[in-house]
């Protein structure tokens, strides 16, 4: 890879993880809209944005090829349920003052990825990776044993996104095409819920202020733009390099929660964060050491 491609890849990766990191600020703007309604808008408008993007980039041939493989289509239904659940839990957490725990979930996620890789893909742990995973587990167990609480939201986000990544890895479908099919699977449920079941003060778009409707439609942009940046970065950078950017998102979430939204991490959360941060430091050092050996 030449230097120009690498620079472009770095900028795209920074853009993707920066947008993901500050996404909670967008959801805070529409905190008064129920989380399930925000999810339906995210699904509906993401679908239409993906249709537009695939049309502009002329990638419908890939969609046609995918439609000829029923097994992949049905596996994308599973990944759609996983990512939909992840989106719903994240939106609910942010708008119910659990942004810190959401950030913890995405700090834990890389370690869960390692664990699932070992269990389902036959990948072997290096010693330092074992240590990192054990420390992360200890952080959760100490919180449970000492404080009688469990970071359910964090674990839910970490495991749902990790299983989503595992399923997508197994399917091996291009990101944009896969997301179109995922949102297509979720579209009927989202549309039926929004137009037939939801009955809140914001569920009828014809009665909403234009500014609110534009914010709700922006859910599609918040979803698709960072994905496009990420896929662009993935084609220009080595995966080992791209992996180091994944901590930008949860770090920004943590800073937003503490600095702007008044969330104060209690002793139980700080104990768990401390274990996770040490585990991630070991994980990153091991990755750097392994990369240099190659």
UniProtKB/Swiss-Prot annotation:
Topology of the protein relative to the lipid bilayer: Multi-pass membrane protein
Subcellular location(s) of the protein: Cell inner membrane
Ranges facing Cytoplasmic side: 1-11, 61-72, 123-128, 168-179, 235-238, 291-294
Signal peptide: none
Keyword Cell membrane belongs to the record: yes
Primary subcellular site in the record, as a coarse category: membrane
Positions in the Periplasmic compartment: 35-37, 96-99, 147-149, 198-211, 262-270
Residue intervals of the EamA domain: 18-145
Keyword tags: Cell inner membrane, Cell membrane, Membrane, Transmembrane, Transmembrane helix, Transport
Chain segments annotated as transmembrane: 12-34, 38-60, 73-95, 100-122, 129-146, 150-167, 180-197, 212-234, 239-261, 271-290
InterPro entries: EamA_dom, RarD
Gene Ontology cellular component list: plasma membrane
Domain of life per record: Bacteria
Family note: Belongs to the EamA transporter family.
Protein name, UniProt field: Protein RarD
Upper lineage: Bacteria, Pseudomonadati, Pseudomonadota, Gammaproteobacteria, Enterobacterales
Gene: rarD
């Amino acid at each position: 890879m030449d230097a120009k491609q690498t620079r472009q890849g770095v900028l795209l990766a920074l853009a993707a993880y920066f947008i993901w990191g500050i996404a909670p600020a967008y959801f805070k703007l529409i905190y008064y809209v129920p989380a399930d309604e925000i999810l339906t808008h995210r699904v509906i408008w993401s679908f239409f944005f993906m249709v537009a993007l695939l049309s502009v980039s002329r990638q419908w041939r890939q969609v046609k090829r995918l439609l000829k493989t029923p097994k992949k289509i049905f596996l994308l239904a599973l990944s759609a349920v996983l990512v939909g659940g992840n989106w719903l839990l994240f939106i609910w957490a942010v708008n119910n003052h659990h942004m810190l725990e959401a950030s913890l979930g995405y700090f834990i996620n890389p370690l869960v990825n390692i664990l699932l890789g070992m269990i389902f893909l036959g990948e072997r742990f290096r010693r330092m990776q074992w240590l990192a995973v054990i420390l992360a587990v200890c952080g959760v167990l100490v919180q449970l044993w000492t404080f009688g609480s469990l970071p359910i939201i964090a674990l839910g986000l970490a495991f749902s996104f990790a299983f989503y990544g595992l399923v997508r890895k197994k399917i091996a479908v291009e990101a944009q095409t896969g997301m179109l099919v995922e949102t297509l699977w979720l579209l009927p449920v989202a549309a039926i819920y929004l137009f037939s079941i939801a009955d809140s003060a914001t569920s009828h778009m014809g009665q909403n202020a234009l500014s609110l409707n534009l914010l709700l439609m922006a859910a599609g942009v918040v979803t698709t733009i960072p994905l496009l940046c990420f896929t662009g970065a993935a084609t220009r950078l080595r995966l080992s390099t791209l992996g180091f950017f994944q901590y930008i998102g949860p770090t920004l979430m943590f800073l937003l929660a503490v600095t702007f939204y008044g969330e104060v991490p209690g002793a139980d959360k700080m104990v768990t964060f401390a274990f996770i941060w040490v585990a991630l430091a070991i994980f990153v050092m091991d990755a750097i050491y392994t990369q240099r050996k190659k």
